[in-house]
Amino acid sequence: MIGNWNYGTGRRKSAVARVFIKSGKGDIVVNGKPIKEYFARETSLMIVRQPLELTAHAETFDIKVNVTGGGETGQAGAVRHGITRALIDYDATLKSALSKAGYVTRDAREVERKKVGFHKARRRKQFSKR
């Protein structure tokens, strides 16, 4: 806990989110913008709110987020992971419900690198028999 803020770091793909939560009326600010302005897609907004709705804390916390790297989906996943960790920092009894829903575990999938002699990570050059 930092002052009266609870903190959690979230990661997904190449995105990293630093999440601060404190008691409030449900305002979520991402990189200085309201969440609806920052995340254009409804699915991204839904992903971010999942841990709050699961624990019935959607309107009880003000959340401040700094997120860098990645794209929209990766950043939304990183924010969700960070909110989950901040909620656990606030109340450790929430951990079992959040882990059962799969929000505590970091999604370790990363982009596979392109290999030399291939078009993409696994796509080989076309083989010609003759």
From Swiss-Prot:
Keyword annotations from UniProtKB, A to Z: Ribonucleoprotein, Ribosomal protein
SUPFAM superfamilies: Ribosomal protein S5 domain 2-like
A GO-annotated cellular component: cytosolic small ribosomal subunit
MF GO annotations: RNA binding; structural constituent of ribosome
Gene: rpsI
GO biological process: translation
Alphabetical list of PROSITE patterns matching this protein: RIBOSOMAL_S9
Pfam family, one: Ribosomal_S9
Organism annotation: Cupriavidus taiwanensis (strain DSM 17343 / BCRC 17206 / CCUG 44338 / CIP 107171 / LMG 19424 / R1) (Ralstonia taiwanensis (strain LMG 19424))
PANTHER family assigned to the protein according to its UniProt record, in alphabetical order: RIBOSOMAL PROTEIN S9 (PTHR21569), SMALL RIBOSOMAL SUBUNIT PROTEIN US9M (PTHR21569:SF1)
Superkingdom, taxonomy of origin: Bacteria
NCBIfam families hit by this protein: PRK00132.1 (NF001099)
Protein name, per record: Small ribosomal subunit protein uS9
Recorded family membership: Belongs to the universal ribosomal protein uS9 family.
